[in-house]
Design a protein with these regions (language model features):
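Radical SAM enzyme core and accessory elements
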Residues: 150-225
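Short, glycine-/Ser/Thr-/acidic-enriched flexible segments
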Residues: 63, 141, 177-180
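A broadly tuned preference for mixed-charge, low-complexity surface segments
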Residues: 8-12, 48, 73, 135-147, ...
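Short linear sequence motifs
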Residues: 38, 127-130, 200
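Conserved non-cysteine loop/helix-boundary elements of the Radical SAM core domain that shape
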Residues: 1-122
Length: 225
């Protein structure tokens, strides 16, 4: 995250951004293959504030390998000091392509713990920060069988998050791996809505060289009957 990139967003009317630490424990970031540092997250957040962004979300993951309740508490205290406008707390869900799954032997000595105490702690701190829950969703293979919860300050809720979960809103997505979705306004006889998607390639280099193809995919999706 750089000043130049943030200014491009500001100059094009983007008002809500996410700066996602996942955790504020550097050892965990190194373990799970995240290539940013805790200090980079803090510096990026402060830079965005300085440039006028007043609706910033931060994502956390609870249940990361080797992290204790104390580690989660430490992360929440750093978040409290930064005071983001939105906080999204994810329970760890190991996907098929995730590094934790692909290299599972490397992580077998690290316990993955996500308890009601972990979730309650994040909820308590969020409330103390003046953030209130406004959306919730679940995924497969979630640690502790819990859920993901989005918190927001009054007037700062991400409407997009609600719309995408309800699957009632067409969405144009840009970037490698992004999925565009068209929801037909006219309902089916059973009351459901027709939904079709157009996905961008995941590889960044491929996305750049095939950008015209990606644009054409979206164009076809939104012009078809």
């Amino acid at each position: 995250i750089t000043r130049e990139k943030l200014m491009v967003l500001r100059n094009h009317g983007i008002s809500r951004i996410s700066i996602n630490p996942q955790t504020m424990k550097q050892e965990t970031l190194n373990l799970i293959g995240r290539h940013h540092t805790v200090q980079q997250t803090i510096d990026s957040f402060n830079l965005a504030r300085k440039l006028g962004f007043d609706n910033i979300n931060m994502d956390l993951i609870v249940g990361l390998p080797g992290e204790s309740l104390s580690d989660v508490a430490d992360t929440m205290e750093v978040i409290r000091k930064l005071a983001p406008d939105n906080l999204t707390v994810h329970s760890l869900a190991i996907k098929r392509a995730a590094r934790l799954n692909i290299q599972r032997e490397r992580y077998q000595d690290f316990e993955i713990v996500n308890t009601a105490d972990h979730i309650a702690l994040t909820s308590k701190v969020a409330e103390e920060m003046g953030l209130f829950p406004y959306y919730l969703y679940r995924q497969k293979n979630m640690a502790g069988n819990f859920e993901n919860v989005g918190y927001a300050a009054p007037g700062k809720a991400g409407v997009y998050n609600v719309l995408i979960m309800e699957e009632k809103q067409s969405i144009v997505a840009c970037g490698a791996g992004a999925s565009t979705k068209r929801v037909w306004v006219q309902p089916n006889p059973d009351g459901t809505h027709r939904i079709e998607r157009a996905e961008n390639v995941k590889d960044v280099a491929q996305y750049i060289t095939r950008i015209d193809e990606m644009i054409e995919r979206k164009s076809r999706l939104f012009t078809k009957e």
